[in-house]
Amino acid sequence: MQKLKQQVFEANMDLPRYGLVTFTWGNVSAIDRERGLVVIKPSGVAYETMKAADMVVVDMSGKVVEGEYRPSSDTATHLELYRRYPSLGGIVHTHSTHATAWAQAGLAIPALGTTHADYFFGDIPCTRGLSEEEVQGEYELNTGKVIIETLGDAEPLHTPGIVVYQHGPFAWGKDAHDAVHNAVVMEEVAKMAWIARSINPQLNHIDSYLMNKHFMRKHGPNAYYGQK
């Protein structure tokens, strides 16, 4: 697990590097599917002092199997998503400013241009709010459940992120680094959408044919963007 712990540590350290977190407001995890184990950031440990050895390993029930610290308080959310979506290899949660603003407003981040379409096939959805019973019960688990309720059976890697109403963004990817990459993009397109709608409140969504072209040339079966 040392290699995965190093990967998760590096991905967590990318959060402050890319301006996605303030203090300890974020976490990254990755899963070893063969072993059924997840590596995640320890709860409340400052990035300035954190080391790869501090990463916490949990099983799919959330039991700590390796590590001196308690795992992130959002661990149950991560585990619920891993259980539901086998294509996920890494998950990120932050409170990045612009994506969180859309979450607090209770609005999906609209797909307005090609930057968005290069990564997200459609709007980045916003979940419903959790009920008082859901919050007072198993809050973090229920956060995962409301994300799954919103995504349904859609391929999560086609829309690799979501904003949880009144909470903040979650992003995911093939591994921890890919998840962070998608979290960075989500924050950028959230900012772009806010600015664009401020300039033109009547702005429509990107044309579907342009969205299809940009997404499929990077992610479709005949993708040709980048190098092989």
From Swiss-Prot:
Reported cofactor(s): Zn(2+)
Organism: Escherichia coli (strain SMS-3-5 / SECEC)
Residues noted as binding Zn(2+) in the record, renumbered to the chain: 74, 93, 95, 167
Function field: Catalyzes the isomerization of L-ribulose 5-phosphate to D-xylulose 5-phosphate. Is involved in the anaerobic L-ascorbate utilization.
Gene Ontology MF terms: aldehyde-lyase activity; L-ribulose-phosphate 4-epimerase activity; zinc ion binding
Induction of the gene: Induced by L-ascorbate. Repressed by UlaR.
Binding note for cofactor: Binds 1 zinc ion per subunit.
Domain of life: Bacteria
High-level lineage: Bacteria, Pseudomonadati, Pseudomonadota, Gammaproteobacteria, Enterobacterales
Active site: 118 (proton donor/acceptor), 225 (proton donor/acceptor)
Catalytic activity reported: L-ribulose 5-phosphate = D-xylulose 5-phosphate
Pathway stated in the Swiss-Prot or TrEMBL entry: Cofactor degradation; L-ascorbate degradation; D-xylulose 5-phosphate from L-ascorbate: step 4/4
Gene3D superfamilies: Class II aldolase/adducin N-terminal domain
InterPro entries: Aldolase_class_II_sugar_metab (IPR050197), Aldolase_II/adducin_N (IPR001303), Aldolase_II/adducin_N_sf (IPR036409), UlaF (IPR023499)
Protein name (database record): L-ribulose-5-phosphate 4-epimerase UlaF
EC number, UniProt record: 5.1.3.4
